[in-house]
Regions:
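N-terminal strand-loop element at the rim of the active site
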Residues: 8-71, 76, 156
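Aromatic "clamp/platform" in nucleotide-sugar-dependent glycosyltransferases that forms part
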Residues: 260, 279
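Conserved acidic donor-binding segment of nucleotide-sugar-dependent glycosyltransferases
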Residues: 311-312, 316-324, 332-338
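Short, structured helix-loop element that forms part of the nucleotide-activated donor/catalytic region
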Residues: 44-51, 226-252
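Short hydrophobic beta-strand element within catalytic cores of glycosyltransferases
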Residues: 296-300, 309
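A conserved, positively charged/aromatic
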Residues: 105-140, 144-151
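A conserved mid-protein helix/loop that constitutes part of the nucleotide-sugar donor-binding site
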Residues: 16-24, 191-220, 227, 240, ...
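Short His-centered aromatic/hydrophobic patch
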Residues: 87-93
Length: 378
């Protein structure tokens, strides 16, 4: 029986949740599907260890799309003759729909995985939605933004959460935690607060630093606490501001920059608390993974729209872009006993497992069901 070809399109494979998710999906697809991956460019591949042999199959060789790249993409689709085009990220969605329409691909699925979409994208989405059989969102918040601001039909958007491997992202044994802390040079007794994600406006590292400074000025930032920023620079200006702020008196010894971390699980294992005061998110993949690994978490409301954290039981939720509540949550977390934090972490793992990964292939089965539904209807 011939395999069904699915053509995946994403700008690149640099550090980021969508990039990891698309490769996880390709790796776990049933054998009756044949995956073909195409990127704008193959530079600075962060997820190389997850790439199946021969992927990405196509590299357009551009940093940003243009008409010549659109022609190349259209030609590739005509040669590959996929049954489905499935694109990830806003700009890729625009070009994928255009190329798929030109090439006569019968089914196009577009994936929106973050909020605060560009104004141009929102402005064109109302018209372009007719080129997508289905628009997949990974968060209730993303769907709400598409329906409210882009005027996409409610029934056109379906929410399928991120793939979460709770067998891999699990709490460490005592020996694994000790090894992880040694690897990340955390001395005995040091409390590690982890903010994973690219350095930029979205993840709001500046907000966390401001809250730390407030506690330090009040004499309430503990000498044994350190914040770990794990992520590449998203943009030069914000990254420079974050690093300059981190050198402020009272903060310099309490902040470490780790750049992009490939073995993120070991960093979860080494840490004591996850902190993500994001200004906007789709479904925060790092929050899911960290909680599955047994970390209690402080999340902004923007990062917790899909109820990753249960306030008071598995962590803290703070209003987005509010300084005082973040200060209060940090102070409360730092005053919480290790035993209570561990209890919250165990409850957090149970919660995210039940909500986002109740069985091994829960999300994969939902994705495959969408493919099968559209193939049957076509």
């Amino acid at each position: 029986m011939p395999r069904t070809k699915v053509f995946y399109f994403i700008p690149n494979l640099q550090q980021g949740g969508p990039e990891g998710q698309i490769l996880e999906l390709i790796n776990r697809l049933p054998q009756r599907f044949e995956a073909v991956l195409c990127v704008y460019h193959g530079d600075n591949v962060f997820w190389g260890n997850r790439c199946p042999p021969g992927q990405p199959a196509h590299d357009l060789g551009v940093r940003s799309m243009n008409m010549a790249a659109l022609d190349r993409l259209t030609d590739i689709l005509r040669r590959e003759k996929p049954a489905i085009v499935h694109s990830y990220r806003d700009k890729a969605n625009f070009w994928a729909r255009w190329a798929a329409s030109r090439a006569g691909v019968p089914i196009t699925i577009t994936g929106c995985r973050n909020r605060m979409m560009g104004l141009r994208y929102l402005a064109t989405e109302w018209f372009l939605q007719r080129k997508s059989k289905v628009i997949l969102a990974n968060s209730i918040g993303v769907k709400q933004e598409l329906v409210r601001w882009a005027r996409v039909r409610d029934d056109k958007v379906r929410v399928i959460y991120n793939l979460l491997d709770v067998d891999f992202f699990r709490p460490p044994t005592a020996a694994e935690r000790a090894d992880a802390r040694t690897r990340w040079q955390l001395a005995p007794g040091t409390r590690a607060l982890l903010l994973p994600g690219r350095i930029g406006i979205q993840k709001h590292q500046l907000g966390l630093l401001a809250a730390m400074r407030t506690l330090a000025r009040r004499g309430k930032w503990p000498q044994d606490a350190v914040v770990l920023f794990a992520g590449r620079a998203r943009d030069k200006l914000t990254s420079a501001l974050v690093r300059r702020f981190a050198r402020s008196p009272g903060l310099a010894s309490a902040v470490r920059f780790l750049d992009a971390v490939k073995d993120i699980r070991s960093l979860y294992w080494a840490s004591d608390l996850l902190v993500m005061p994001s200004l906007y998110e789709g479904l925060a993949n790092a929050a899911l993974e960290g909680c599955a690994a047994g970390l209690p978490a402080i999340l902004s409301h923007a990062a917790n729209v899909d109820a990753i954290v249960q306030p008071g039981a598995t962590g803290w939720e703070v209003p987005t872009l509010r300084h005082a509540p973040l200060v209060e949550a940090l102070e409360a977390a730092l005053a919480t006993t290790p035993e209570r934090l561990a209890e919250m972490g165990r409850a957090g793992r149970a919660h995210v497992t039940a909500r986002f990964a109740p069985r091994k292939d829960h999300v994969l089965d939902q994705m495959v069901a969408v493919y099968d539904e559209l193939l049957t209807a076509d």
